[in-house]
């Protein structure tokens, strides 16, 4: 029987730590389910990228890392903000899996409580390989490209991701209000 693992992250953006973790996950199982957390969120400072943009980053980064020889699934997971049932919710949203890979102690606890095998994968340079640090560097105009796969840096440039993050950081209040205003569809 095929052994399938689950790995959940927000990927805001995909960085070298994610890819190192996924290399470990891919080495342990036959197939990988990659859950994209906070799937409903985008265009905020904490979650600047859309789910489809994060999927594209993952596809490109996994190809660049030559991790496409095994089957993987990208599954959007909107937030439910209810920790007690979160693991059950995830189980209902993804294909069957045998083992959970995580570096997050809460995620590990929630899946263990549901009877799943959990492997706490090694963390890779968490001090700088964090999406929060990468977004901070983008806002401050500091070098960030070496912290993400080359293909991800190229994609972020293609979609003007740095400009988006800087706009969100400098115009946080006004941009949040603008983004929450109803979109007017022209009448024909």
From Swiss-Prot:
The family database entries (Pfam families) matched by this protein are listed as: CTP_transf_like
Q: Pathway, according to UniProt?
A: Cofactor biosynthesis; NAD(+) biosynthesis; NAD(+) from nicotinamide D-ribonucleotide: step 1/1
What EC designation does it have?
A: 2.7.7.1
Which keywords belong to this entry?
A: ATP-binding, Cytoplasm, NAD, Nucleotide-binding, Nucleotidyltransferase, Pyridine nucleotide biosynthesis, Transferase
Where's it found, cell-wise?
Cytoplasm
Of the GO CC terms on this record, one is: cytoplasm
Keyword Nucleotidyltransferase in record: yes
- Top-rank taxon of the source lineage equals Archaea
Task: Give the family from UniProt.
Answer: Belongs to the archaeal NMN adenylyltransferase family.
Report the PANTHER family cross-referenced here: BIFUNCTIONAL NMN ADENYLYLTRANSFERASE_NUDIX HYDROLASE (PTHR21342:SF0), PHOSPHOPANTETHEINE ADENYLYLTRANSFERASE (PTHR21342)
> What name appears for this protein in its UniProt entry?
Nicotinamide-nucleotide adenylyltransferase
Which organism is this protein's natural source?
Answer: Thermococcus kodakarensis (strain ATCC BAA-918 / JCM 12380 / KOD1) (Pyrococcus kodakaraensis (strain KOD1))
């Amino acid at each position: 029987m095929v052994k399938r693992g689950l790995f959940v992250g927000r990927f805001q953006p995909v960085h070298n730590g994610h890819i190192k973790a996924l290399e470990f996950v891919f080495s342990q199982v036959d197939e990988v389910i990659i859950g994209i957390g906070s799937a409903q969120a985008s265009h905020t400072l904490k979650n600047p990228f859309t789910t489809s943009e994060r999927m594209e980053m993952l596809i490109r980064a996994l190809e660049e890392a030559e991790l496409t020889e095994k089957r993987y699934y990208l599954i959007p997971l909107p937030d439910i903000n209810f920790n007690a049932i979160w693991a059950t919710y995830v189980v209902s949203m993804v294909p069957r899996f045998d083992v959970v890979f995580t570096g997050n102690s809460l995620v590990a606890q929630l899946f263990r409580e549901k009877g799943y095998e959990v492997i706490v994968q090694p963390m890779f340079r968490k001090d700088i390989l964090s999406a929060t640090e990468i977004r901070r560097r983008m806002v401050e105009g500091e070098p960030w490209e070496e912290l993400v796969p080359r293909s991800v840096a190229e994609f972020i440039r293609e979609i003007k991701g740095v400009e988006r993050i800087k706009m969100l950081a400098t115009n946080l209040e006004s941009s949040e209000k603008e983004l929450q205003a109803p979109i007017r569809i022209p009448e024909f």
